[in-house]
């Protein structure tokens, strides 16, 4: 038991991490096991209840226990679970990313498919926080592993190209990478439909941003029709895709179509999840934005209010998140030609 705990501790950030969080990652019911290790002197602890391994102990543990993907699967699964909880932010994300970085550097890769999946699940969460250092490490690691043709799947190769496109600054290069990613997948199946839909959405987004509305429309519509075809409209990925498509339709002077897509999505989220979750709020906020763009203030107000009611409930302990949202919407007003600015908070709270 203790050796297993030690073996996972090799990946802790050198600045340490909260004992409670670490115990949760390892699914330990209590802190007893960690406290025992602190008592033996193997694990260092500070006043703030953070734990870390002494570098010398770390070195010995690495060579003695050889932590591997198979052996440390609970830790890897826990980190992936956090990265896959859409819309849920954790305040220790830097420590999480440092731990992932140490895993990449130090773990024995004895189960390659499981390891590749770990990298692929962590990358989008790093992207949320624009954690470039970690994103670059993951891309490099995937490149190294996927060089031999017999390792990995078409989907792995498509994801690598998609990740590279995410970090690519030149639009034409990013577009080429997304097209190459799509070319990796010959047959669309239930297993890869979500990925292919995402790739079309990303490509559509790039075309939209670079002034190719016809191509943007083609790929955005393909992306949504795949979600529809494979009954995936209720999953988290569909939300940004449909929201972006609705905004695109509004830019193309078709706001009614955009609004009807979003209302359909609202219904689906309500049916599969609830009407007080973060995803529902995001859709309400997008509806508010479109009504703003079409100068329909009463409707805009209704939808923003609905969104904020949910944000204020979910982020009750994080007033700065709510404040940041207010700021974000406040900036929308002048951009869209309304200079209501300061009255916004008043407008929404009435």
PLM region spans:
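Amphipathic alpha-helical segments of tetratricopeptide repeats
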Residues: 104-105, 140-147, 180-187, 224-229, ...
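Extended alpha-helical scaffolding segments used for macromolecular assembly and cargo binding
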Residues: 1, 71-145, 149-152, 156
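Conserved alpha-helical positions within TPR/SEL1-like repeat arrays
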Residues: 120-127, 155-170, 194-209, 220, ...
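Short coil/turn linkers that connect adjacent helices within long alpha-helical scaffolds
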Residues: 109-110, 148-152, 187-191, 229-233, ...
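C-terminal boundary/linker of central alpha/beta nucleotide-binding cores
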Residues: 1-65, 72-77
């Amino acid at each position: 038991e203790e050796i297993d705990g030690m073996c996972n501790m090799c990946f802790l950030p050198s600045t340490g991490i909260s004992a409670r969080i670490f115990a949760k990652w390892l699914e330990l019911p209590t802190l007893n096991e960690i406290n025992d290790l602190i008592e033996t002197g193997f694990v260092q602890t500070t006043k703030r209840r953070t734990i870390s391994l002494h570098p010398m102990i770390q070195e010995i543990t690495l060579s003695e226990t050889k932590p591997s993907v198979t052996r440390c699967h609970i830790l890897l699964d826990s980190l992936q679970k956090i990265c896959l909880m859409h819309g849920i932010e954790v305040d220790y994300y830097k420590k999480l990313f440092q731990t992932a970085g140490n895993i990449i550097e130090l773990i024995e890769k004895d189960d390659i498919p499981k390891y590749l999946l770990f990298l692929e699940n962590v990358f989008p969460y790093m992207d949320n926080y624009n954690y470039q250092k970690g994103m670059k490490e993951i891309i490099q690691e995937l490149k190294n592993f996927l060089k031999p043709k017999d390792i990995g799947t078409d989907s792995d190769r498509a994801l690598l190209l998609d990740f590279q496109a995410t970090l690519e600054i030149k639009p034409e290069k990013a577009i080429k990478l997304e097209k190459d990613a799509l070319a990796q997948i010959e047959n669309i199946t239930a297993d890869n439909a979500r990925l292919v839909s995402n790739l079309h959405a990303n490509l559509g987004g790039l075309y939209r941003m670079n002034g190719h509305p016809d191509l943007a429309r083609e790929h955005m519509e393909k992306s949504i029709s795949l979600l529809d075809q494979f009954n995936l409209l209720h999953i988290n990925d569909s939300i940004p895709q449909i929201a972006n498509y609705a905004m695109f339709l509004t830019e193309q002077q078709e706001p009614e179509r955009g609004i009807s897509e979003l209302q359909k999505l609202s219904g689906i989220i309500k049916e599969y999840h609830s009407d007080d979750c973060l995803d529902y709020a995001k859709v309400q906020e997008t509806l508010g934005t479109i009504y703003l763009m079409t100068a329909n203030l009463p409707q805009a107000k209704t939808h923003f209010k609905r969104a904020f009611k949910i944000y204020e409930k979910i982020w009750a302990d994080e007033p700065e998140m709510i404040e940041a949202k207010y700021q974000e919407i406040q900036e929308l007003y002048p951009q869209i030609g309304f200079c209501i600015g300061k009255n916004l908070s008043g407008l929404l709270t009435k």
